[in-house]
Amino acid sequence: MVLVKKPVLKPFASLEIKVDPPITIGETSLGLRXFIPIPIRSGTITGEVKGRILPGGADSQMIRANGRTDLSARYVIETADHELIYIENNGIRQVSKPFRKQAAAGEIIEPEHVYFRTVPTFETGSEVYQWLHDRLFIGSAERTPDYVLLDIYEVQ
C-alpha cells in the first residue's frame, strides 16, 4: 500500500480587518441577505506577507434558516514592499444551535460556539508574490464588534 503524504498546515498570515456593521437587504428565497457594500475600513496583515488592508473592500453574507452563514469577502492588501494583492475569501460561519437567535439579532457570539472557516485565494501582478497563485490556503476566523480576525494557513 502506498502512503500518501498528509497535508500540513503552515501558519501564513494573521489579519485584523476593521469592518462596519452590515446593511441587511432582507429575506430572500435563499435566506436573509446581509450585504456590506464598503465594510472594510482598514486593517493589517502580519506573517509571511506584511502590510495593510486598503479601505473599500466588499463583503456579502447569506444567513440560512439553519443558522449557517455563507460569506464572500473581497479586498486588497498593500504589502510593506508596496505590492498589491487582491484576496477573495469565501467561507462559512455556523453558530452552535443554542446561540443562533442571539447571532441572528446581531450579537457577537464567543468563538468557542462558532465554526468560522474560509478558503482565501490571492491574485497579484507582482513577481515577488506570484507563488501565491500556486498554493492552497485555509483560514480560521473570529468576529468581534469591530473586527474580523483571520489566521491563514498554507496547505503543504
From Swiss-Prot:
Signal peptide (from-to): none
Pfam families in the cross-refs: DUF3237
Matches recorded under InterPro entries: UPF0311
Family: Belongs to the UPF0311 family.
NCBIfam families xrefs: PRK00872.1-2
Name used for this protein in its record: UPF0311 protein YveG
Lineage of the organism: Bacteria, Bacillati, Bacillota, Bacilli, Bacillales
Gene this protein is translated from: yveG
